[in-house]
């Protein structure tokens, strides 16, 4: 378990080495999109134009796409989850990651105090849900086992949660 600072920036080299190795390891990244423990500075996990310490005019670069990098190896289980949006999808992703014999990385959208939530951290679950509902954070699962069965390994879960029946 690690934060986005350790996964996208400072410890990225080690993380990349581990997922490239093919070893059976499970990784959970709590993605706050800023360096939370040191006061909310911008990081490689911060989205374009986001305002944080050291990027008062907005971040110029793109957010590093850790999921796409992991998926590019072809042998890494990858999931984007949001604890407030769907606990069922979160549990499904965690179970799939655990059962996968190889590296897995689950990236969890994690609101933090540095986001300046107007109603406080007591509403973090609600904020995590809103991030998915508005399309900011996509819930997805990439399971290489499906590709071996001739199926699409990428499953987007967000649209399934918020599509109304006709």
Where in this protein do the model-derived segments appear?
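Conserved small/polar residues in nucleotide/adenosyl-binding loops
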Residues: 162-166
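Glycine-rich ThDP/TPP pyrophosphate-binding loop and its adjacent helix/strand module
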Residues: 9-26, 30-158
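DG-centered beta-turn motif at the end of beta-strands
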Residues: 1-8
């Amino acid at each position: 378990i690690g934060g986005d600072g350790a996964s996208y920036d400072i410890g990225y080299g080690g993380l990349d080495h581990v997922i490239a190795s093919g070893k059976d390891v499970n990784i959970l990244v709590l993605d706050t999109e800023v360096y939370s423990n040191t006061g909310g500075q911008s990081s490689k996990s911060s989205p374009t134009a986001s305002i944080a310490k050291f990027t008062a005019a907005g971040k110029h670069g793109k957010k590093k796409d850790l999921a796409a990098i992991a998926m590019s190896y072809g042998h890494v289980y990858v999931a984007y989850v949001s604890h407030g949006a769907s606990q069922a999808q979160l549990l499904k992703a965690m179970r799939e990651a655990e059962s996968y014999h190889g590296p897995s990385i689950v990236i969890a959208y994690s609101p933090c105090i540095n986001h300046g939530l107007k109603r406080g951290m007591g509403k973090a679950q609600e904020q995590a849900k809103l991030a998915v509902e508005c399309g900011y954070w996509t819930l997805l699962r990439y399971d290489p086992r499906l590709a071996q069965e001739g199926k699409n390994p990428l499953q987007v879960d967000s649209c399934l949660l918020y599509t109304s029946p006709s």
